[in-house]
Amino acid sequence: HCVTRRQRQMCIRDSSTSYVYTFVSAFGEEGPPSPASTVLTKVDGQTVTISGMDTATSKSNTNLANKRIYRSNTGSNTTNFQFVKEVSLATASTTDNLNNDALAEIIPSTYWIAPPDDDTSTYPNGQMLGLTAMANGIFAGFSGKRICFSEPFLPHAWPVAYRITLEEEIVSIAMAGQVLFIATKGTPYIAAGTDPQSMSVIRMEAAQACLNKESLVDMGDLAIYASPDGLVGASGSEITVLTAGLITPKQWQAQFYPSTIKGFLWQGKYIGQYYTGSAYGAFMFDYRGGKNSFTTISSLATGHAQGGFTDPDDNELYLIDYDSGGGNAQVELFQGSTTNTTQTFKTSQFVLPRPTSMNFVKVEAEAYSGSGITVKVFGDGTEIFDATITASGSVFSATGSAPTSFSATTIMEPILRLPTGVHKVYEVEVSGAHTINEVCIGESIDELRAI
């Protein structure tokens, strides 16, 4: 019992306390606290020596520079560690003589641990991948089935409480408008929220798996990736197969090898590179362009693109290009040449109610110079016509190789007669180094002239 005023004051000022310290990088990034020291009794005004603090950085490759020391302080309801002082990394011991009421802010980094790393004893699914910036300074990443979020504006701090486990294995993540799109090996998810403590994760009602993490691209207002059925677009809570009216799932799998697709953003368009097993191919897709939006490209780079970056300052796509042997890496500007490359466009299948004879094909292009414009027509899956149109002034010339070869024939307009035959399913393919405005087939020449 305290029987005098002086003894009563000493009882109030005596307190049980302990210390922790944190590492701080040269950039001000603070880590989680050390284990607490042995509890001791401290009286205000008493000097305590703090010793045994680590001074080496061998356990971390994070450019550590300082240590922050905190002391426990018990209030009326809770006990918190409060700031005492900051010392250099090389300091192994220091002293503390602060009174309780002189202690500063409560330690903020109690739960600020690093993201999952490659220590499989702690993280069996491996290190965190897919670092993505969200709104309000939050970063997201994933490991296995777990989606992780950082503290706002602190990309080094990833509390365990901010990690959510999904039902599906995560393949990749990207922003899709105002939400985070989570592509998986099964059904995709979205995550939305302004605070990592209250993130909402929703499973979408569409079984569209992501076949390759490198196919997922943030297009600004939506995310696009390669699924088994075609290119899929995700915006908000909506998900759509964008190429459904252009390419059938069977064509998509057979011609574009979606599990190999690497995607890039170029001037609002999705650029894809794929690998057939023996050669590289590419395509360009404008999701706002309707039925004329999908164009194949002979090649994306001189060799093949290993990676790429869209520069927001000039809206250009820069590719890391490798030659066919896998060496001689260089950076190339996509579409940086003044010479047009050959483009190829093939329509989707036109299925007629009954077998019909389509007798003419028309190709309207900006120019027909050089190697001209080649047009192929397919009937019921078989190539029935192959010809090339060139022009000199207003006079056109056509040469062909199907159904049989024919030499240069002068024509007055870019309309060609097709071989006789009836078919129920038609497809048309055009290629050339000039802008092609229109391609159509019809039963009569007057029908095409009227278009």
What is the role of each PLM region?
Residues 26-42:
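Extracellular fibronectin type III
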Residues 26, 45-47, 208-211, 218-222, ...:
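Beta-sheet repeat architectures centered on beta-propellers
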Residues 1-8, 12:
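Single conserved hydrophobic/aromatic residue that forms the stacking wall/gate
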Residues 57-69, 73, 77-78, 370-374:
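Solvent-exposed loop/turn segments flanking beta-strands in beta-repeat/beta-sandwich domains
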Residues 45-64, 96:
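Conserved aromatic anchor
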Residues 15-28, 96:
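Beta-strand-rich modules
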Residues 67-115:
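Recognizes extended acidic, P/S/T-rich segments that occur
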Residues 153, 193-196, 237, 287-289:
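Short loop/turn segments that connect beta-strands within beta-propeller blades
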